[in-house]
């Protein structure tokens, strides 16, 4: 079995919701919920939060989790890569799990880890599109080859369907990633691509440079906390047993 680390990048100064990782959610910091759910996933050897903020480090450790202090980073993936270098033993598979997903399902983490079987160097998840989501730019769409590797990710409705209506070929991307430790270093060393800049989608960097991304199915819809209103929704969902 390969050594697997789930690393959760977190920063304090989010523009829309400063201090978000430490926001109270059912009596504990939001980031603690992400850690606890990741710890429930089968096949995970270590879960760690990667942050450049001492307040987050203290909160995670007070909740019984592991936190790694990093330097300033351009992206969450850069922060994950730095944290992975500091782990001992060095993980063979690194899962990049967003720190604003307190309702993450352990099965989704297991699915992206499972997608790394068979020699994949990078993997992510996708789910069926709900009605009306194809046209929404907030929902990232992905289309894949017959092999299951990604052809393209876009905020636009892809593919265009000449017959009209919504295409059954596109799925909604769920932003959880797994990398081999070696490819994580390769990825973070790549120059940002033009398509990545146009779409504001970091994963396009791999495709632009000719690397494959395996895409596995999940039933998890994804629920990131971007605003205080999102936090209220999460509180209601947790109270209802989510």
From Swiss-Prot:
GO terms for cellular component: cytosol. It comes from the Bacteria. GO terms for biological process: CMP-keto-3-deoxy-D-manno-octulosonic acid biosynthetic process; lipopolysaccharide biosynthetic process. It is an enzyme of class 2 (transferase). Its EC number is 2.7.7.38. Keywords: Cytoplasm, Lipopolysaccharide biosynthesis, Nucleotidyltransferase, Transferase. Belongs to the KdsB family. This is 3-deoxy-manno-octulosonate cytidylyltransferase. The lineage of its organism: Bacteria, Pseudomonadati, Myxococcota, Myxococcia, Myxococcales.
């Amino acid at each position: 079995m390969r050594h697997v680390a789930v690393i959760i990048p977190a920063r304090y100064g989010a523009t829309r919701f400063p201090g978000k990782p430490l926001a109270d959610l059912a009596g504990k910091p939001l980031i603690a919920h992400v850690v606890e759910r990741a710890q429930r996933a089968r096949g995970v050897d270590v879960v760690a939060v990667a942050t450049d903020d001492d307040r987050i480090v203290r909160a995670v450790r007070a909740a019984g989790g592991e936190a790694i202090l990093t330097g300033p980073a351009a992206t969450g993936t850069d922060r994950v890569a730095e944290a992975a270098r500091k782990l001992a033993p060095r993980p063979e598979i690194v899962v990049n799990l967003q720190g604003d997903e307190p309702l993450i399902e352990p099965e989704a983490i297991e699915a992206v880890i499972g997608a790394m079987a068979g020699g994949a160097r990078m993997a992510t998840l996708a789910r069926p599109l709900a009605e009306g989501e194809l046209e929404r730019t907030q929902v990232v769409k992905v289309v894949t080859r017959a092999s299951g590797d990604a052809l393209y990710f876009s905020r636009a409705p892809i593919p265009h369907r000449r017959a009209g209506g919504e295409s059954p070929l596109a799925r909604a991307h769920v932003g959880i990633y797994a990398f081999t430790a070696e490819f994580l270093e390769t990825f973070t060393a790549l120059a940002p691509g033009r398509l990545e800049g146009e779409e504001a989608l970091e994963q396009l960097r791999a495709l632009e440079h000719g690397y494959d991304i395996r895409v596995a199915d999940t039933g998890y819809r994804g629920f990131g906390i971007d605003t205080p209103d999102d936090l209220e929704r999460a509180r209601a969902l947790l109270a209802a047993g989510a």
